[in-house]
Amino acid sequence: MRLPNYYTAPEFERAGLRRREAEWIRARLLDPASVVVPVWRSQNLVIEVAGGEPRAASLTLEAVGGIAADEIEERLAHGHLVFLGVVDERAHFALDVSASETPLETLRSPTLAAAGIAAADGGSEIGVRFADLRQLAGRLERSEGALLALARAMLFWHSRHRFCGACGAPTRSEEAGHMRRCTDDACKTMHFPRTDPAVIMLVTDGERALLGRNRNFVAGMYSTLAGFVEPGESLEDAVAREVMEETAIRVGTVHYHSSQPWPFPANIMLGFYAEATSTEITVDEGELEDARWFERDWLRTHVDDESFRLPRLDSIARRLIGDWLAE
């Protein structure tokens, strides 16, 4: 059985039907046992314990001092609170603290106990900080990474959709943060969270795989090719087009592998294997710095080399390569 990709959590209950139940949402926001997932300018709150791995700092409402009853409607309307779903029968909300220059003080400097992290996690020294989820590179538990990714993605969407794309009037958050509506009575356009589809593919030629290098990559890193799906294009056509545009390689058979949400800022990565029907590479220097064929056995023996790197462990790119190497 194939494990889900990182940033996915099948066990997480989104409870979508609850989003329109205003009284239920309000009751959960008055429940001290409900949980908030703080986000500050697209960074997530994490707790680091000396000698252990970082943990997501999901805090109970009680731990952050609660939310005043007369502030709930305003915070929901502005999209500063977003209902994420239910975990272990407790409602979880993304909490935007981006307006604060001192976010940890805004959260009343959460302690080890408040964050629910046991001292047995590996050390007596703790650090609470806001961090870029990408830099944690899959070190969080899978379920925690998925929760933080969802909170980050939803609040990013709200921050970019304060105004109506149809008429320019301000928008207001509804359905517990899962829709924004234009406030102009003549418009009232509804806006929903968007996810931009992108294909990501490992192109193979027998025992060889095609990997490319973007000039922004860290030294020595090569990865799979990828690109956005264009309007009116099938996923398979997008795979073939992107590979041709970036490397001049033609592909034939295309096989779906899996997908991965990638909230950096708002993508869904659709993973494929593609079989090459040509082998001569011509790199589009506007897209890539380099592209080359790598033998499977060579990759197996150089995965941990200091001079050569594969993509991060939390990425579907690494999953595509890893599964191919395991064959």
Regions found by a protein language model. Name each.
Residues M1-G79, F83-H161, R172, V218-Y222, ...:
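Nudix hydrolase/Nudix homology domain
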Residues F83, F163, R181, I200-L202, ...:
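Conserved hydrophobic/aromatic beta-strand scaffold that supports enzyme active sites
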Residues V86-E89, D205-E207, S278:
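Short acidic-glycine loop/turn motifs at beta-strand connectors
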Residues L148, A153-F156, R160-I200:
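Acidic, metal-coordinating catalytic segment for phosphate/diphosphate chemistry
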Residues R180-S223, R250:
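N-terminal strand-loop-strand
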Residues T224-S258, F272, S278-E280:
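The catalytic Nudix box helix
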Residues Q260-N267:
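Acidic pyrophosphate-coordinating catalytic loop
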Residues I268-A291:
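Non-heme Fe(II)/2-oxoglutarate
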